[in-house]
Amino acid sequence: MGGFTSIWHWVIVLLVIVLLFGAKKIPELAKGLGSGIKNFKKAVKDDEEEAKNEPKTLDAQVAQTKVHETSEIKSKQES
């Protein structure tokens, strides 16, 4: 009684699928599923290649910001 080990379980499952989708629709569903998996694998591969080509570090300069003290701000607001 360990799940779907009997051939009759699989026959019933396949019969229900045929009844739900129809015999003509099943190949279309399988084709769509196959192309979806193929596109997913291609996208994963492209992302991995893109990650390999990206630089490891960024060569950028960080802008220094001036920190204003509260006394400087008050004097500027009063003038």
Curated annotation (Swiss-Prot):
A Pfam family this chain is assigned to: TatA_B_E
Composition-biased stretches (Basic and acidic residues): 66-79
Location(s) in or outside the cell: Cell inner membrane
UniProt keyword list: Cell inner membrane, Cell membrane, Membrane, Protein transport, Translocation, Transmembrane, Transmembrane helix, Transport
Transmembrane segments: 1-21
Gene3D superfamilies named in the record: 1.20.5.3310
GO biological process, one term: protein transport by the Tat complex
Membrane topology: Single-pass membrane protein
GO molecular function: protein transmembrane transporter activity
Cellular component terms (Gene Ontology): TAT protein transport complex
Region (Disordered): 48-79
Family stated for the protein in its record: Belongs to the TatA/E family.
Assembly mode: The Tat system comprises two distinct complexes: a TatABC complex, containing multiple copies of TatA, TatB and TatC subunits, and a separate TatA complex, containing only TatA subunits. Substrates initially bind to the TatABC complex, which probably triggers association of the separate TatA complex to form the active translocon.
Known function: Part of the twin-arginine translocation (Tat) system that transports large folded proteins containing a characteristic twin-arginine motif in their signal peptide across membranes. TatA could form the protein-conducting channel of the Tat system.
Protein name per its UniProtKB record: Sec-independent protein translocase protein TatA
Species in which this protein is naturally found: Helicobacter pylori (strain Shi470)
Lineage: Bacteria, Pseudomonadati, Campylobacterota, Epsilonproteobacteria, Campylobacterales
